[in-house]
Curated annotation (Swiss-Prot):
Record's protein name: Nuclear pore complex-interacting protein family member B2
Ranges of compositional bias, category Low complexity: 278-287
Taxonomic lineage of the native organism: Eukaryota, Metazoa, Chordata, Craniata, Vertebrata
Organism (species): Homo sapiens
GO cellular component: nucleus
Sequence segments annotated as region (Disordered): 256-397
Gene name tied to this protein: NPIPB2
Main location (coarse class): nucleus
Transmembrane spans: none
Family: Belongs to the NPIP family.
Length: 397
């Protein structure tokens, strides 16, 4: 009891700087022990010895309390080490004694220890500072809300304008893209049309050439005489009319070329001229006239049937597809092949037409007559009554 009072007198009653320093140092530097015992109690007990019995009693109580404390801590599952617990209690005690704060005037950290307590002026200043800070925060919130609202409205307007502009730009870009695509398509179409026109013109040219070739085509039976006639005419003219010395000219080509030029003048040739054969009769030296439309080229004069010496090779400027003379002669000697008739061209006997059953004429069937309509072949005897027979019999008698 005396020890407890002494502790109260040291800690609370006489709160001097020296006593607080002694207690704090004892609490900081003591070793492992319990709250009920330890170095502070031991020093108090040693500092106030009265009698030997009191010392023994206190010592016995100290041991029993330490033993019971140790047992209770082990049963509750607490950690045996009390250094951490004591430090935690000491920090809580200091926190309860006073708060650490900042002085508004000096802007320095104020300790909460008993020697450095916060004054009334600092408390008032701190309160005003908190109020000012709260008002500033509220003002800032209001201003921020107003600015945000204003920006929101303006932002919507600007967004609408931007959207309209973007829509117009998109439409303009889309129109430009469509125009460019149409131009590209038009160019491709024109190119394709040009290609088809070339193909069509080429086909027309080939068709015209084929028609000309078939028009100028002569049967093999008339080629030999015609070629002799053409060679004779070329030799007679001596290229005076501009005709090339080519014996394979067709009748149509010769006719066309000689028809546009005037007839050449008559020329006399000597017998020593190598261009004509000595076997050629003098009647054939007459200048032939250009053939007319009614001339029969298939029947040339007899003097033209005489063969002539071989002529010069054909020139490169004439592109006429007439076979050579040897081929013509070989074809002329061959007998003409019989013409093949197609199945559609063959005349077949007319097939009898099929008639329907309704169209076929059948003999008329005899009509059935009724029994009343049929005329009897021999008249049947009429039956007489008995009264008439009796009367007649009586009369005869």
């Amino acid at each position: 009891m005396f020890c407890c009072l002494g502790y109260e007198w040291l800690s609370g009653g006489c709160k001097t700087w020296h006593s607080a320093w002694v207690i704090n140092t004892l609490a900081d530097h003591h070793h492992r022990g319990t709250d009920f015992g330890g170095s502070p109690w031991l020093r108090i007990i040693i500092a106030f010895p009265r009698s030997y019995k009191v010392v023994l009693t206190l010592w016995t109580v100290y041991l029993w309390l330490s033993f019971l404390k140790t047992i209770f801590q082990s049963e509750n599952g607490h950690d045996v080490s009390t250094d951490v617990q004591q430090r935690a209690r000491r920090s809580n005690r200091r926190r309860q004694e006073g708060l650490r704060s900042i002085c508004m005037h000096t802007k320095k950290r104020v300790s909460s220890f008993p020697g450095n307590k916060i004054g009334l002026k600092d408390v008032i200043t701190l309160r005003r500072h908190v109020e000012t800070k709260g008002r500033a925060k509220i003002r800032k919130m209001k201003v921020t809300t107003k600015i945000n609202h204003h920006d929101k409205i303006n932002g919507k307007r600007k967004t609408a304008k931007k959207q309209k502009l973007s829509v117009k730009e998109c439409e303009h870009a889309e129109k430009e893209r469509q125009v460019s695509e149409a131009e590209e398509n038009g160019k491709l179409d024109m190119k394709e049309i040009h290609t088809y026109m070339k193909m069509f013109q080429r086909a027309q040219e080939l068709r015209r050439r084929a028609e000309d070739y078939h028009k100028c085509k002569i049967p093999p039976s008339a080629r030999k005489a015609l070629c002799n006639w053409v060679r004779m005419a070329a030799a007679e003219h001596r290229h005076s009319s501009g005709l090339p010395y080519w014996p394979y000219l067709t009748a149509e080509t010769l006719k066309n070329r000689m028809g546009h030029q005037p007839p050449p003048p008559t020329q006399q040739h000597s017998i020593t001229d190598n261009s004509l054969s000595l076997k050629t009769p003098p009647e054939c030296l007459l200048t032939p006239l250009p053939p007319s439309a009614d001339d029969n080229l298939k029947t040339p004069p007899e003097c033209l049937l005489t063969p002539l010496p071989p002529s010069a090779p054909p020139s490169a400027d004439d592109n006429l597809k007439t076979p050579p003379l040897a081929t013509q002669e070989a074809e002329a000697e061959k007998p003409p092949k019989p013409k093949r008739w197609r199945a559609a061209e063959m005349e077949s006997p007319p097939e009898p037409k099929r008639r329907r059953a309704a169209e076929v004429e059948s003999p008329p069937e005899p009509k059935r007559r009724r029994a009343a309509e049929v005329e009897p072949s021999s008249p049947e005897p009429k039956r007489r009554r008995l009264s008439k027979l009796r009367t007649g019999h009586c009369t005869q008698a």
